[in-house]
A protein has these predicted regions:
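Glycine-rich, positively charged N-terminal anion/phosphate-binding segment
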Residues: 3-13, 35-50, 57-93
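Flexible, glycine-rich active-site loops centered on histidine and acidic residues
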Residues: 108-156
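Short, acidic/polar
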Residues: 32-44, 108-115, 193-204, 285-295
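Active-site pocket-lining/capping segments in soluble small-molecule metabolic enzymes
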Residues: 11, 131, 144-177, 182-192, ...
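Conserved, mostly hydrophobic/aromatic
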Residues: 24, 52, 118, 205, ...
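Catalytic cores of alpha/beta
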Residues: 107-120, 197-201, 226-229, 249-255, ...
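Glycine-rich, proline-tolerant flexible connector loops at the mouths of alpha/beta enzymes
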Residues: 28, 50-80, 133-145, 210-226, ...
Length: 333
């Protein structure tokens, strides 16, 4: 039962009962090399990932005190290199990559140049996202000359796919069209007034051209199933890929709900309170994730996406246990 997926379109059209998994990585911090990133991928590649997502991080402002005592504001990007990292992963491993393209911190020109770079590199699959608001902002503020919403970004990519640049000029030799996915939120986006409104926006992104969606992480499968049911009733037909992150530390009981705006189920919270160390919490997180994934596979969601930040070893253990049950195939070494 090896993974024969070669691109995201094949994955989305796969009508077999074969189980798949994918995962997300972050570009290295500015000044760091790729060794740690590649070690993490090396741990997970043996389980035949369908694709690897690479996040994009907007610039942020820091303040430095000058010699005269005044503060000077400087724009920095802590994790640059998304396009280069995506290309390096694709070349090194031959695994389909899906880099994030975001509105946050980017002008339309920035995005156009990024799309050109991706096209030159033969990268055809994208995740289109608005991106997070800046730390110092209460609400999302678009960059001057940038986009306010994902749908605006989608429109730019659609025009690019038609060979039209933002200045109205046209490509002499248009490349292959980008295929793109979007984010969705089983427990609604933090800025949405309610889940119904959030689902309307997901439907709009589908109508604009999105071909799949990946969820924010969640720990309660029933909330995910309810979300999918409501989405289908509202006309959302694109594949919805569930996103999972193993619970890793005791502190996450409080941090995760605030950071990712998702609930910790009462059963999981109760079990976590019995843990006496981070290692016990990590083992609990692995058990819970295995349980989640088995249940998702049983309900027909044959691709599960993992968020791996600070959790690579846990995801590896989850994969090992799924292999032991026969749900996934591991490469022979």
């Amino acid at each position: 039962m090896g993974n024969n997926i070669t691109d995201i379109k094949q994955l989305l059209n796969d009508e077999t009962d074969e189980k798949h998994f994918s995962f997300e990585v972050l570009p290295p911090l500015k000044g760091n090399g790729t060794a740690s990133l590649f070690r993490n991928i090396d741990q997970l590649k043996e389980f035949n990932p369908s694709f690897i997502n690479i996040t994009t991080h907007h610039s942020e402002f820091v303040y430095h005190e000058r010699e005269d005592g005044l503060l000077e504001r400087q724009s920095i990007r802590r994790r640059p290199g998304t396009v280069a990292i995506a290309a390096a992963i694709q070349q090194r491993y031959g695994i389909p990559v899906i880099p994030h393209v975001i509105c946050s911190g980017a002008t339309k020109e920035d995005i156009e140049y990024e799309l050109l770079d991706l096209q030159f590199l033969g990268i055809e699959n994208l995740m289109l996202l608005r991106g997070d608001k800046a730390r110092e902002d209460r609400f999302f503020t678009p960059t001057e000359g940038g986009h306010s919403h994902t749908t605006e970004l989608i429109e730019q990519v659609n025009s690019f796919n038609e060979g039209i640049f933002i200045d109205g000029s046209t490509m002499k030799h248009p490349g292959r069209r980008f295929v793109y996915g979007v984010a969705c939120y089983p427990e609604k986006h933090e800025e949405a007034p309610n889940l119904e409104q959030d689902l309307r926006y997901l439907k709009m992104k589908q109508d604009f051209g999105a071909t799949f969606a990946v969820t924010q992480l969640f720990y309660d499968n029933e909330k995910f199933y309810n979300f999918v049911d409501q989405a289908r009733k509202m006309g959302v037909t694109i594949p919805i890929i569930p996103g999972i992150k193993p619970f890793a530390k005791l502190s996450q009981l409080n941090v995760v709900p605030k950071t990712f705006h998702c609930d910790i189920p009462e059963e999981l919270a109760g079990l976590a309170l019995l843990c006496k160390s981070d290692e016990e919490a990590r083992l609990l997180g692995i058990e819970w994730a295995v349980r989640q994934v088995k249940d998702l596979y049983a309900h027909g969601f044959n691709n599960v996406h993992f968020y791996t930040v600070s959790a690579v070893s846990s995801v590896h253990e989850v994969m090992k246990r799924l292999v032991e049950t026969g749900l996934l195939q591991q490469n022979s070494k």
